């Protein structure tokens, strides 16, 4: 092995997160890793309490459910992150777009009487 291919004590490799120290063979590292996990069961596996996949916290809702909220319409955390909206019977998908010349969002296909009832201006817009 060439001396230049072996990292020295002052060199850090990008793929190894371990701090520099005395080199150990893989056979010497296995008992040390097993002892750091705690007691080993008779089957040779770590006890269930030390399983790292079971340590993940459960995904919760981003906002708490308040009075008047319907649990049936509450979105799962996985579906909240998806960019595409899902239309149901109670919450139809309504496309939003920017008004030309301003920064407000407009709803497409809103009937004019609903627009006027919400305080919209009855004058025609210049296009």
UniProtKB/Swiss-Prot annotation:
Pfam families reported in the protein's UniProt record: UPF0731
Comp. bias regions, Low complexity: 24-39
Chain positions covered by the region annotation Disordered: 1-96
Highest taxon of source: Eukaryota
Protein family (similarity comment): Belongs to the FAM229 family.
PANTHER family: PROTEIN FAM229A
Protein name: Protein FAM229A
């Amino acid at each position: 092995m060439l001396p230049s291919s072996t990292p020295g004590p002052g060199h850090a490799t990008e793929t190894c997160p371990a701090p520099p120290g005395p080199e150990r063979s893989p056979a010497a590292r296995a008992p040390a890793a097993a002892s750091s996990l705690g007691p080993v069961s008779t089957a040779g596996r770590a006890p269930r309490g030390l399983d790292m996949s079971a340590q993940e916290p459960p995904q919760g809702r981003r906002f708490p459910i308040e009075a008047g909220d319907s649990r049936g319409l509450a979105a799962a955390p996985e579906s909240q992150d998806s960019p595409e909206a899902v239309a149901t019977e109670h919450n139809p998908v309504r496309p939003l777009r920017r008004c030309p010349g301003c920064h407000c969002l407009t709803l497409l296909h809103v009937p004019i009487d609903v627009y006027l009832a919400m305080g919209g201006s009855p004058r025609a817009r210049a296009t």
